[in-house]
Amino acid sequence: MVGFAGALRALGAEVRVCAPPDFADLLARVGVPLVPAGQSVREMVRQVFAGKTPPSAADLAAGVIAGQADAVAGAAEGCDVLVAAGLTTAAAGAQAVSEKRGIRYMYAAYAPCYLPSPHYPPLSLHGQPVPPDVTDNRVLWDLHAQGMNAVFGAPVNAYRASLGLPAVDNVRDYVSTDHPWLAADPTLAPWTEPADFNVVQTGAWILPDERPLPGELEAFLDAGAPPVYVSFGSMPMRQAEEVARAVVEAVRAQGRRVLLGTGWADLTLIDDQDDCLAVGEVNQQALFRRVAAVVHHGGAGTTTTTARAGAPQVVVPQVADQLYWAARVADLGIGTAHDGPVPTAGSLSAALGTALTPETVARATAVAGTIRADGATAAAKTLLDAVAG
């Protein structure tokens, strides 16, 4: 979303983003004001992962709507269009605000697996098992809609009622509309036609990053062969110490140096040997061109950045669309999908062994040339043309 907001501003549009406070620094880089909404995403994720009894999806939904919808309502004042992405509940609140104010509404998904299609099944919903004898994708998507209603219907409709709006009986389709955008690269995440509604695939919304790498990191890169970069990004990772040990041992087993991204798991090095370096948030667009491989959680942004850099990747998916991205990486032959969310030294070393083969490296290099970098600008132009028309 930050890349899209920056592209809109570069084209002369007045833009404001209503989002959790975690995004303030990113938005400052593109000169777009943040209207804070809700609690920190990092803190919310930490609480969910740390809790012995995680809150129910319905309780989380109610909390997200309560924390964000009023802020969205204020931020939308005077706007011509409201673009929503991300969590269903946050988008549902935004949709209700746009409906109440009579503002044009657009929804963008970051992966095809969030949009109903006859060509693949939906992501599974926690606590909503699918009958084993059901294999028709359209039926599975109908069951998915029912599950979404069961989880999110009450809090979404309660908020709508507070605005004097009627209830909706299909939260998922209400949020995504019949003309959503797909903010994902067509090579990595193609939208398959024919489908039941009109999807506009804009390409991934990449935020250009021109920041130099820190001096210590530059020195480490220059001191030896390209390392393997490992980070789980925004995933807290239970048993982080054991995960860090498994990661370092797995990379060393492949005869490679280790670049450990601390991420929200706060991973730390297991010893003081000079073949390892821990780094925080850095310019991944520059870094990934200089590593032997990338091990990550499978977020849409990290997967796209890695593919665009031409680095082979190992995806260790944790939740949601990360499973989709892991499968796409494996299907394209640009890396491997780790089996399960918790890597061991042995399992990760085996996955890296495949990712580092000459065949996978060559395939990753070839696919890199097909990844578009103009998705955010394309989407911004499309939106401004629609508003002007």
Where does each model-flagged region fall?
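Donor-nucleotide binding loops and adjacent catalytic segments primarily
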Residues: 5, 184-293
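Conserved nucleotide-sugar phosphate-binding/catalytic loop shared by glycosyltransferases and other
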Residues: 16-57, 133-136
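Nucleotide-activated sugar donor-binding and catalytic core shared by glycosyltransferases
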Residues: 1-16, 22, 26-29, 56, ...
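Structural motif
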Residues: 80-81, 179, 227, 293
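Short gly/pro/ser/thr-enriched loop/turn and capping motifs at secondary-structure boundaries
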Residues: 24-25, 41-44, 107, 111-118, ...
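Generic beta-sheet signal
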Residues: 18-20, 37, 106-109, 202, ...
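Conserved nucleotide-sugar donor-interacting segment of glycosyltransferase catalytic cores
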Residues: 66-138, 187-189
